[in-house]
């Protein structure tokens, strides 16, 4: 399966847990591309069979996600009905489920079907989650 992992961390760059998530998916025989939300425009997203969105909360208390995520998903026309997964990196003790809900809300706004959501604890956990995609 051809999978896009959209990385929307708090700061620019690809964090280790996203690389581990992609590594787990590749171990299951999938073709995986990591798209950085800070540098990509989202136009390539319709070409993938499955889209995994990984984000981090930008605030410690509020569950707010990076604004760039909505822009990237909005630019990728043709996402209606696309199977997808939502992941959020656990960054604090509170409101992490609200941040995950906000990621899923942004995805569903574009018509994507979110069939899996999870909170990532660390890179090893992310790799284990990646091995469950398509299984």
Residue ranges and their predicted role:
Residues 1-4:
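Extreme N-terminal starter segment of soluble prokaryotic enzymes
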Residues 6, 13-135:
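FMN-binding flavodoxin-like domain, especially the glycine-rich phosphate-binding loop
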